[in-house]
Amino acid sequence: LHARGFLSKPVYGKTRKNVNRIAVFPGEDFDWEQDEHPMLSYCESVCYCMHVRGFTMHASSKVTHRGTFAGIAEKLDYLQEIGITTVELQPVYEFDETPEEVNTKTSADIVATAGENGGELPGYRVLNYWGYREGFYYAPKAAYAAEEDAALEFRQLVKEFHKRRMEVILQFYFPKGMDV
């Protein structure tokens, strides 16, 4: 049995203390309405790789729910119009995008030391915008949801893709040595 989410919706980019998470196990009562995987031929597919937050976060996207699964749903007609048949989503599972501890040095201090150690900044952790790290693979990222139920919103997005005969592919990152 795997959790499909966690109680409480975190604010994207806000540091969270490493505390026990309360898992949510939603029922399987989602109405897929006879939804079927489009099964498109790869040689006839036009793929578009996107980041949920990055695709619709800017005001120029003109969506109501910026940076969310619902925001992508608002842009599906546009994607279909330009000929996209398949969207590959960069990690959409729950992951911590911020470190537990935040370094308090000024940006001038950071810039001054950036040239040392080949550009690496020992002791600094940056925002994990992309999500390529270990995570909770069965739980859609709550910060990518416009509403409280990220699992429901993600399922609705997949269903909207399929209504347009569009496929959705998910990327996952599994750290070296992880037993998968």
What is the predicted function of each stretch?
Residues 74-93, 124-125:
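Catalytic domains of carbohydrate-active enzymes, especially glycoside hydrolases
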Residues 1-47, 57-61:
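The feature marks proteins involved in alpha-glucan
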Residues 44, 83-85, 164-166:
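Short, well-ordered coil/turn segments that N-cap beta-strands
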Residues 90-97, 172-180:
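Short, solvent-exposed turn/loop segments enriched in Gly/Ser/Thr/Pro and often Arg
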Residues 50, 79, 89, 137, ...:
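Conserved, mostly hydrophobic/aromatic
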